[in-house]
A protein has these predicted regions:
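Extracytoplasmic metal-acquisition and chelation regions
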Residues: 2, 7, 18-19, 29-363
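Extreme N-termini of proteins with methionine-enriched Sec-type signal peptides or N-terminal signal-anchor
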Residues: 6, 12-13
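Sec-dependent N-terminal signal peptides
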Residues: 13-23
Length: 363
């Protein structure tokens, strides 16, 4: 099973939807030229973020100067990044903003088409994965992990061999070439406190470049300095906790979006699916493998993400020898709504809570 196949079924559908949305926006007859904002005189700086972590980082940077901004979180209802499709209104909002911030992974392929209709030709576009550069990680299938539609793809391959082996080999060769040219990257870059520091600093630089008021710019820079100090302190707490832990491996009865987090602190993991997977049912082999790892490593917990129904985790536990492990939840921040964010939910607190969960999992 190749990781690149995870997205194959979604691409054509998403592309068709985007074409229809772009056509709808064009029918609305958007006209006019974009201009850089002179914040505080000609208008506010419009910033559009796709997901919650970006939104929260911007809030931290502009703290005390919020009245000079229009800040929008596109996935305001807690929609998952992997399933999100922008509406015509979303595309209109993006087209007129001053700064647009998005992750830049496979799930954001719609952005390219949306930006073609930008009214503001001076828009600053921030692709966070591009900002990270070599820190962005390719998706990986670790031992025991179930590939997307594993059994279905296996049967399809058998049919190809039976009916047209030569064509199948040719398709496989072409697909392999595509894989080498365009590897799939793990999109969950925000689940690293170290990455958050890098990305927040870059975002602050772009915000400051748009504001002509020196005092406000000083505020942004001071806010960033304070925020980075908090994140750096949390990073050190993670390092100390992992060093003091009795174990160094976690088992996830779920999809696994925490690659960046565990890699930061050299934590090993086993999981049912990769982070971008749409699978909800684990195979017998996957369940058996994960349960075996829980027994082998004498683990007292099985972990899930915040939106899990815990069915896989419960099944893993029921297949262990002791059958008494606890289920813990790590929050991947993929279901936070704008209302929750505006009500006080924030990136730092969530990552601090994740640290406490991790401490218990590594006992």
């Amino acid at each position: 099973m190749r990781v690149t196949e995870v997205f194959d079924k979604r691409k054509m559908h998403k592309r068709l939807i985007m074409m229809l949305l772009i056509a709808a926006v064009m029918v609305l007859g958007i006209t006019g030229c974009g201009k850089k904002k002179d914040s505080g005189s000609n208008g506010k700086i419009d910033i559009v973020c796709t997901i919650f972590p970006e939104y929260d980082w911007v809030k931290e940077i502009i703290k005390g100067e919020e009245d000079n901004f229009n800040l929008t979180m596109l996935m305001a209802n807690g929609a998952d990044l992997h399933n999100f499709q922008p509406t015509a209104d979303d595309i209109l909002t993006i087209s007129k903003c001053d700064i647009f911030i998005y992750v830049g992974g496979e799930s954001d392929k719609w952005v390219h088409d949306a930006l073609k209709e930008a009214v503001n030709k001076d828009m600053i576009v921030i692709n966070l994965m591009d900002v990270l550069g070599d820190r962005a990680k390719e998706e990986e299938l670790v031992e025991g992990m179930q590939g997307e539609d594993e059994h279905e793809h296996h049967h399809d391959d058998e049919d190809d061999d039976d009916h047209d082996h030569e064509d199948a080999d040719e398709d496989e060769h072409e697909h392999h070439d595509d894989e080498e040219e365009e590897p799939e990257y793990d999109e969950h870059i925000w689940l690293s406190v170290k990455n958050a520091e890098i990305l927040a600093e870059y975002i602050e630089g772009k915000i400051s470049s748009l504001d002509k008021d020196e005092k406000r710019v000083e505020t942004y820079k001071k806010n960033l300095e304070n925020y980075k100090a908090k994140l750096d302190g949390l990073d050190k707490q993670y390092e100390e906790a992992v060093k003091a832990a009795g174990k160094n491996t976690i088992v996830f009865g779920d999809r696994f979006p925490f690659r960046y987090l565990v890699d930061d602190y050299n934590i090993k993991y086993y999981a049912a699916f990769i982070g971008c997977s749409a699978e909800t049912e684990a195979s017998f082999e996957t369940i058996t493998f994960l349960a075996g790892k829980v027994d082998e490593l004498s683990l007292q917990t099985v972990l899930t993400i915040e939106t899990s129904d815990k069915q896989i985790a419960n099944t893993v536990i029921s297949n262990t020898k002791d059958k008494n492990q606890k289920i813990l939840t790590l929050d991947s921040m993929q279901a936070v709504t704008a209302k929750e964010a505006d009500g006080g939910k924030n990136y730092y607190d969530i990552m601090a809570t994740n640290l406490e969960v991790l401490k218990e999992a590594l006992k």
